[in-house]
């Protein structure tokens, strides 16, 4: 791809409306990824390890269970300890969700806007490291939101009573919900 095919000159991002030539193996791989979120996460998601830098996402058994639970249930509540990889698991699933489904609206909400934006930036890092043939073209890309050419959108915001007011969302990820004041939590 030439520079004009990249979003704002970023060679890691495919610009919207850029045709991609697929070979047979890529078509089969795309179908496999579309049908199996776990396969997609294990094969294509990259994360930052504090010790090793950028590495493939090594999915633990409890994370496999979380992915299956989220994929097969409309509502999911997970009560998990800190630093267990739950956010990495969820953002991997969110990425799968918006890539392989059109017109999806996802809200990432956390007790602080900075936390929500950090989660979105981790998702964006994983997105940048996908092969171009797996990427949807990028319409907009910033610290607070991501819009893809398939009509899917992800927004990051602090958890407040007005955070998602006026919008319709297919998925809402509430991180650090224990730190949200009870009067705000009741609005959800």
Predicted regions and their residues:
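Phosphate/NTP-binding elements of NTP-utilizing enzymes
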Residues: 1-188
């Amino acid at each position: 791809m030439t520079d004009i095919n990249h979003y704002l000159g970023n060679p890691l991002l495919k610009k919207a409306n850029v045709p991609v030539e697929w070979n047979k193996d890529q078509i089969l791989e795309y179908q496999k990824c579309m049908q199996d979120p776990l396969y997609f996460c294990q094969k294509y998601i990259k994360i930052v390890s504090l010790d090793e830098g950028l590495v493939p996402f090594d999915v633990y058994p409890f994370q496999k269970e979380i992915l299956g639970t989220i994929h097969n249930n409309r509502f999911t509540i997970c009560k998990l300890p800190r630093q267990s990889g739950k956010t990495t698991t969820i953002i991997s699933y969110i990425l799968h969700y918006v890539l392989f489904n059109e017109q999806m609206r996802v809200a990432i909400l956390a007790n602080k806007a900075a936390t929500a934006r950090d989660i979105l930036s981790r998702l964006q890092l994983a997105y940048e490291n996908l092969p171009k043939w797996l990427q949807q073209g990028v319409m907009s890309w910033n610290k607070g939101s991501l819009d893809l050419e398939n009509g899917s959108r992800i927004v990051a915001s602090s958890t407040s009573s007005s955070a998602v007011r006026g919008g319709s969302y297919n998925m809402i990820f509430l991180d650090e919900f224990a730190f949200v004041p009870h009067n705000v939590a009741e609005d959800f």
